[in-house]
From Swiss-Prot:
One of its GO terms (cellular component) is mitochondrion. Residues 63-611 are cytoplasmic. Residues 69-110 are annotated as: Disordered. InterPro entries: TPR-like_helical_dom_sf (IPR011990), TPR_rpt (IPR019734). It comes from Mus musculus. One of its GO terms (biological process) is cellular response to virus. Expressed in the base region of the oxyntic and pyloric mucosae. This is Mitochondrial import receptor subunit TOM70.
Length: 611
C-alpha cells in the first residue's frame, strides 16, 4: 500500500507514498478525516487552543472554516470579527460625565488628575478621528503624564492610543514601545498585543510577532479572523526561513524499505523497477535459495538492479554513477534510476540534471523518457510550479500515449489542482490500459467520493461507497483500496468498519508504519481513547523510526495535551527526516507554533484547553 500522511489522495501526486515530501511520482493514500489535500498543510501549525480535529491534525484552520460553515452566510452574526481592524483609539471622543466630572474643556481645579488625563485623551481622540495624528500624540502624551501611576488600566489605554497614532504615521518602533508599556500595565490587553504584533511584523521581528499574535488568538478564543490570518502569515514566513537554512545542510537519508517499495508500486510501466531479466543474471548461483544471483555483465546499472532486489538500497546511487561515468550500455537507465533515488533521499537538486538528460536523449527508450517526465513533473508540483508540472505530464502523454503511468500520476495532479472531472478521465484512461491496476481504480473511486462529499451529494456519496465495496472485493490484496475506503468510512462516522479496513491494511502490509498512525488517530476520533491512539503511533515509530508522519502526528497530539517540550522534540525529529524544503517548512511552522505557545504560557499564564 502506498500509504501516505493524512492528506487527501490528491496530495500524493506531489509526494512519495508515506511522506508528502517531494519525491517524484508516488501514489499516496489519504488518512482519516484529513481535509488537508485542499488546504495548505502549514495551517496545521497554529494548533493552539482550537479543538483537535482528530484524524487530521489541522486544528487551527478547521476551527476557522467550521465557524464559516456554521455562519451560513449570516454576515456579522457569524462570530468571526472579519472587519475588526483595531485602527481607532480607545475611549469616546467626548468626556464621560458623572459625579465630580466637568465637561473636560478646561483645567478646572475641581477635576482630578485622572479626569484631566481623560479629558486630554478625549481631545486626542478627536484629533485622531480628524487625521491629525501629531496633535493626537501630544494629547495622549499629556494624558500619560497626568494619569496617576496606580491607574494601570487607564494608563495602558493612553499608551495604546498613542501607539495607534504612531501606527498611522508608520513609526513602528514607537508603536512597539508604547504597546509594550500598555501590556506591562495590562498583560492581557488584546488591542495592544495585536498592535504590537503588527509592528513587529513591520520591523521583521517574526518571533516576537508570532508570540504576540498567539496570545491574541488564545485570548480571543480564535474568533477574530484578522489575528488568525496574521498568525498564519508569520508561521509561513518563519517556516520557510528556517527550512531554507536547515535544508542546505541536511544529511540525505534513505527511507525505509517499505517506503521505497510503496513508491515503486505506484508505477506499472516503469523499466527501472521491473525485475531483472534472465539474460541479465548468470546461472552460477541459481540453485542457492535466498542468495542473490551474480550479475552476468560488469555493469554498474545491473549491479544496482541486483541491489534493488536485495533491498540493499544504499549502494544503488554509487553503482549507477559507475555506469554513467563509463558511458555504458545502460547509461539512460542508470541516469533515471539514480535520479529516482536522489528524489527518494530528498535531493531534488541532484535529481533534476539526471532527469533533464534522460528526457533529452531522443535515442533512449520512450518509456524511460516518459517516466523521467512524470517524475520531473511531480517534482515541479511539489516545488509549487503547477504550470511546469502540467507541461511535463502533457509531454509524457504526447511521446508515450500508451503509458498507463502518465495518466495515473497526471490524474493525481489534476485532483491537486481541483480538476476532479479531468482527473477521473485520466484515471479511466489508465484503467483502460491497465484494467488490473487496483491502485488507479481505488484512487478514481476516492476522487469521486471526495467530489460528492464536498458537494454534499448523498446519492453520489453512496454510489462511491458502493464502488469501494466492489474494489476491495475485486482486489482483496490491494491495501490501498482498504485505506481509502477507511478514509471515506471515517467521514461517514462509520468508525467500526473503518477500523476493520485498517486492520486489513495491517494484515497485508504489517511493516507499513503509516497505517498504524491512521488507526491510532481513528481511536482518538472514535473512542477518545488517547492511550490506545498513542500506543499505535508509538508502534509506528517502532516499526519505522524514519516515519516522519508518526513523529509529526505525535507532536501535534502532545501540543493538544499541553506537553510542549515533548511536542517540540517530536517536531524536531520529523524535521530531520523531511525530504523536501517545503515539507521541512511545514514542520518548522508546527514547531514554531509550539515554541510560541510555550513562551506565551510563561509570560501571560495563557493556556488553551487541552485533551
Amino acid at each position: 500500500m502506498a500509504a501516505s500522511k493524512p492528506i487527501e489522495a490528491a496530495m500524493a501526486a506531489a509526494a512519495a507514498p508515506g511522506s508528502g515530501n517531494g519525491v517524484g511520482g508516488g501514489g499516496g493514500t489519504a488518512g482519516p478525516g484529513s481535509g488537508a489535500g485542499t488546504l495548505p498543510r502549514w495551517h496545521v501549525a497554529l494548533a493552539i487552543g482550537a479543538p483537535l480535529l482528530l484524524g487530521a491534525g489541522a486544528m487551527y484552520l478547521w476551527s476557522r472554516r467550521r465557524r464559516r460553515r456554521e455562519a451560513g452566510g449570516r454576515g456579522d452574526a457569524s462570530g468571526l470579527k472579519r472587519n475588526s481592524e483595531r485602527k481607532t483609539p480607545e475611549g469616546r471622543a467626548s468626556p464621560a460625565l458623572g459625579s465630580g466630572h466637568h465637561d473636560g474643556s478646561g483645567d478646572s481645579l475641581e477635576m482630578s488628575s485622572l479626569d484631566r488625563a481623560q479629558a486630554a485623551k478625549n481631545k486626542g481622540n478627536k484629533y485622531f478621528k480628524a487625521g491629525k495624528y501629531e496633535q493626537a500624540i501630544q494629547c495622549y502624551t499629556e494624558a500619560i503624564s497626568l494619569c496617576p501611576t496606580e491607574k494601570n488600566v487607564d494608563l495602558s489605554t493612553f499608551y495604546q492610543n498613542r501607539a495607534a497614532a504612531f501606527e498611522q504615521l508608520q513609526k513602528w518602533k514607537e508603536v512597539a514601545q508604547d504597546c509594550t508599556k500598555a501590556v506591562e500595565l495590562n498583560p492581557k490587553y488584546v488591542k495592544a498585543l495585536f498592535r504590537r504584533a503588527k509592528a513587529h511584523e513591520k520591523l521583521d521581528n517574526k518571533k516576537e510577532c508570532l508570540e504576540d499574535v498567539t496570545a491574541v488568538c488564545i485570548l480571543e478564543g480564535f474568533q477574530n479572523e484578522q489575528s488568525m490570518l496574521l498568525a498564519d502569515k508569520v508561521l509561513k514566513l518563519l517556516g520557510k526561513e528556517n527550512a531554507k537554512e536547515k535544508y542546505k545542510n541536511r544529511e540525505p537519508l534513505m527511507p525505509s524499505p517499505q517506503f521505497i517499495k510503496s513508491y515503486f508500486s505506484s508505477f506499472t510501466d516503469d523499466i527501472i523497477s521491473q525485475p531483472m531479466l534472465k539474460g541479465e543474471k548468470s546461472d552460477e548461483d541459481k540453485d542457492k535459495e535466498g542468495e542473490a544471483l551474480e550479475v552476468k555483465e560488469n555493469s554498474g546499472y545491473l549491479k544496482a538492479k541486483q541491489y534493488m532486489e536485495e533491498e540493499n538500497y544504499d549502494k544503488i546511487i554509487s553503482e549507477c554513477s559507475k555506469e554513467i561515468d563509463a558511458q555504458g550500455k545502460y547509461m539512460a537507465e542508470a541516469l533515471l534510476l539514480r535520479a529516482t533515488f536522489y528524489l527518494l533521499i530528498g535531493s531534488a537538486n541532484a535529481a533534476k540534471p539526471d532527469l533533464d538528460k534522460v528526457i533529452s536523449l531522443k535515442e533512449a527508450n520512450v518509456k524511460l523518457r516518459a517516466n523521467a517526465l512524470i517524475k520531473r513533473g511531480t517534482m515541479c508540483m511539489q516545488q509549487q510550479q503547477p504550470m511546469l508540472s502540467t507541461q511535463d505530464f502533457n509531454m509524457a502523454a504526447e511521446i508515450d500515449p500508451m503509458n498507463s503511468d502518465v495518466y495515473h500520476h497526471r490524474g493525481q495532479l489534476k485532483i491537486l489542482l481541483d480538476l476532479v472531472e479531468e482527473a477521473v478521465a485520466d484515471f479511466d484512461a489508465c484503467i483502460r490500459l491497465r484494467p488490473k491496476f487496483a491502485l488507479a481504480q481505488a484512487q478514481k473511486c476516492f476522487a469521486l467520493y471526495r467530489q460528492a462529499y464536498t458537494a454534499n451529494n448523498s446519492s453520489q456519496v453512496q454510489a462511491a461507497m458502493k464502488g469501494f465495496e466492489e474494489i476491495i472485493k475485486k482486489f482483496p490484496r490491494c491495501a490501498e483500496g482498504y485505506a481509502l475506503y477507511a478514509q471515506a468510512l471515517t467521514d461517514q462516522q462509520q468508525f467500526g468498519k473503518a477500523d476493520e479496513m485498517y486492520d486489513k491494511c495491517i494484515d497485508l502490509e504489517p511493516d507499513n508504519a503509516t497505517t498504524y498512525v491512521h488507526k491510532g488517530l481513528l481511536q482518538l476520533q472514535w473512542k477518545q481513547d488517547l492511550d490506545k491512539g498513542l500506543e499505535l503511533i508509538s508502534k509506528a515509530i517502532e516499526i519505522d523510526n524514519k516515519c516522519d508522519f508518526a513523529y509529526e502526528t505525535m507532536g501535534t497530539i502532545e501540543v493538544q495535551r499541553g506537553n510542549m517540550e515533548k511536542a517540540i522534540d517530536m517536531f524536531n525529529k520529523a524535521i530531520n527526516l523531511a525530504k523536501s524544503e517545503m515539507e521541512m517548512a511545514h514542520l518548522y511552522s508546527l514547531c514554531d507554533a509550539a515554541h510560541a505557545q510555550t513562551e506565551v504560557a510563561k509570560k501571560y499564564g495563557l493556556k488553551p484547553p487541552t485533551l
